[in-house]
């Protein structure tokens, strides 16, 4: 009588080698999750920030001030900031009359915003096409929390005008002299800005007085 042959598949243990891989696996499919690449690390910022743009081409003489300001994008990490910054026009590329803002999330760059209402702004000026570096260093100082009174800061705006460009840092409480003077001095040092700069209170600016004076100067 012929010897009966065992046709059952051999187990992995019976042959001392691993079982064959599933033939149904698609080409390129990762079966071992331990080998999958980790998502790139991100570096969260202390605050989220929003870019805003005020397009002069959408303004009309009858429109209320600030009605043409629109939010562009909010970022919360270092990586998101650079992704945005590297893909937007820098001040030297903006058209005359444009205003580009970077404010803490949920603070609108308007005098009427409750957080801005009692504040003011420090302003520097430079020639046309000269503000790109100042603007970048201002942004990095703000989002990187380099100011001793960083909680007092609402945001910053760069304004492109016919003969010059202006950058301003907006703050919350104009009456807090120690905080405002500290911010002004640190800002000048960070930018290595040699000229004097002045602090204007928003309530004073609303009066449109040609004889408007700085509340503080550094």
Curated annotation (Swiss-Prot):
One cellular component term from this protein's GO annotations in UniProt: eukaryotic translation initiation factor 4F complex
Tell me a Gene Ontology molecular-function term this record carries. Answer: RNA 7-methylguanosine cap binding
Question: Any idea where this protein resides?
Answer: Nucleus; Cytoplasm
What positions does the entry give for mRNA binding?
Answer: 61-66, 93, 111-112, 161-166, 206-210
Q: Where is this region: Disordered?
A: 1-39
Annotated disulfide bonds = 116-154
Q: What induces it?
A: Induced by ethylene (ETH), jasmonic acid (JA) and salicylic acid (SA), mainly in lines (e.g. cv. Ye478) susceptible to potyvirus such as maize rough dwarf virus (MRDV).
Query: What's an example Gene Ontology biological process for this entry?
Result: defense response to virus
Bias (Acidic residues) occurs at 21-30
Q: What does this protein do?
A: Component of the protein complex eIF4F, which is involved in the recognition of the mRNA cap, ATP-dependent unwinding of 5'-terminal secondary structure and recruitment of mRNA to the ribosome. Recognizes and binds the 7-methylguanosine-containing mRNA cap during an early step in the initiation of protein synthesis and facilitates ribosome binding by inducing the unwinding of the mRNAs secondary structures.
The protein here is known as: Eukaryotic translation initiation factor 4E-1
- Whose protein is this, by species? Zea mays (Maize)
